[in-house]
Amino acid sequence: MVRSILNKYNIKGGTFDQHFLIDIGYLDRIVVAAELSPQDTILEIGAGIGNLTERLARRAKKVIAVELDPALVSVLHDRFDKVENIEVIAGDALKVDFPEFDKVVSNLPYSISSEITFKLLRYKFKLGILMYQYEFAARMVSPPGRKDYSRLTVDTYYFADASILMKVPKGAFQPAPEVDSAVVKLVPRPSPFEVRDEAFFLEFVAAVFSQRRKKLRNSILNTNSMLKIPDIKEVVNQLPDDFVNKRAENLTPEELASVANMLFDLKSR
C-alpha cells in the first residue's frame, strides 16, 4: 500500500529530510501506542504521503497534518480533501502556530528534532509518540554520567517523562536513512523540581553542557557571555564545592537546578 502510493505520485524522498515509513507493522504499532480515542485531536508533523495520517484519522476525532514539501502537500490534498476529519496545513512546522491538539504523533524530520521537540513542549498536550534517530532518542532518556547524557536529556526531563518504546531499523523506511530510528513516548507533566527562573535555568544548562567535560566551576566562568552574571568569579566562589568540582555530565537535573537557582539568587542581589 505505502509503496504503491509512492509509485503513484512518483515520490522518491530525500528532499526536506524525508524518509517514509513503509513498514505497516511499525505504522500500526505507533497508532496503538498513541492510545487514540474518538475525542482526540492529533497533530502530525511531517505528514509526508499520509500513510500514518490515514491510520490516525480512523481512530481520532481529527488529524492536523503539517507538511512543508509542496509536492507532498499536493499528495495530501489529493488523498484527503474529501476526508472530513483531516486538516492539511502547508508550512514549516517550526514557524506554524499549531492549533489546539490533544496528542502529537509523528515521524519527525530528523534535521529539526531538537527545535521541534522544544517547541512542542511549550504546548499543552497529553501524549507524544514521536520518531527520532536512535542516537537522538538515547540522549533524551540517558541517566547522568553516561556519554549520551546531555542538555537534551535535562531539558526533556524538565518538561516531560520520556521513554523509548521501540527501535525501528533503517530498512523500515524508503529511502532508508543511514541509521536506525526509535519511537519515543513523551508525557508532559509539571517539572519534578523547582527553578527560580525557567529561562535562566535553560540557558544555564545550555552553557554548562557546551563544556561538559570541564568542571562546573570552569564551565560557568567560561560561558558567562551566555549567563551574564556580574562579578562572576566572586559569585562562583560562593557555590558549594560538591557541585562546582563536578562536571555537568555527572550532575542530576535536580542538582543542576540547585546550582542554577543559587546563581540566579546571587546575580539578583
From Swiss-Prot:
Keyword Transferase attached: yes
Major subcellular site: cytoplasm
Segments passing through the bilayer: none
Enzyme Commission numbers on file: 2.1.1.-
Example of a GO MF term: RNA binding
Alphabetical keyword list: Cytoplasm, Methyltransferase, RNA-binding, rRNA processing, S-adenosyl-L-methionine, Transferase
Cellular component terms per the entry's GO annotation: cytoplasm
rRNA processing is among the record's keywords: yes
NCBIfam families per UniProt: ksgA
UniProt similarity note: Belongs to the class I-like SAM-binding methyltransferase superfamily. rRNA adenine N(6)-methyltransferase family. RsmA subfamily.
Full protein name: Probable ribosomal RNA small subunit methyltransferase A
Gene giving rise to this polypeptide: rsmA
